[in-house]
Amino acid sequence: VQVHAAHGWLFSQFLSPYYNKRTDEFGGSLENRARFFVKAVEAVREAVGPAFPIEARISGDDLSDTGIGMDECIEVAKMLDGKVDLINVSCGNHEDPALFCRTHPSAFFKRGVNVYLAAEIKKHVKTPVACVGSLNDPAQMEEIIAGGESDYVEIGRALVADPYIPEKALRDEAEDITPCLRCYECFGETVQCENIKCAVNPKIGLQLFSRNGFAPAAEKKRVLVAGGGPAGMQAAITLAGRGHEVTLVEKADKLGGNLHPAGAAYFKRDIAKFCQVLINRVHKA
């Protein structure tokens, strides 16, 4: 069970001096502002028992002059110490659109931009701590844990782009991980309450039908795919995966098409990586 008290949701609003203007036992001092959240955690523990895992998600910093800062977030974490099994440390506030791209880091931020918050919280509690924030590379995740910055690493959008990241990391196949481009395509569909979509994972939502998302073809055919851009490469990969004999032709001297100029800027390196992943899969197919 995760009890979410970050990002401007209800518990987060109680914690924040900006939103919480109450004058009773649930407002004023930090102890009072945290009372509702702590009582909820205690009620969950009473309901599920001592052996059931509970995660509390908090902000390490609202990143706002008027919100709850790191010092108070540390004190909230101390209040949770021993009451939960894991403290998940995020940041930001959905009420401020400018902070959305820090809560869910965009491509303009380095991978793991929010890890420092979990690392600071970890210094003050005995409960295991998890970090979040635009993590995609197993090597970086291992470095974070080995360096003592966090006990666990949690990923969200990265698993939408490639649900098999843990398995590929275990098999030492990190080079085949489809990188999340941090383009927010998945968020747009979530807001519209539609099936989630992903710019780099055409199989999203189809994993229940088969691991590869597409069943083998009933009849093997010889197929010509014209154009070695991202669409052409993915078409060739999918066709080959279904058992067809595929020929992929491209007029340029390299595969990738517009992914090359699209991934040229320093903050678009994920696109360049995605291009190379597709090229590798074409050669393997």
Predicted regions: what is each one?
Residues 1-226, 230, 234-246, 254:
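Flavin-dependent oxidoreductase catalytic cores
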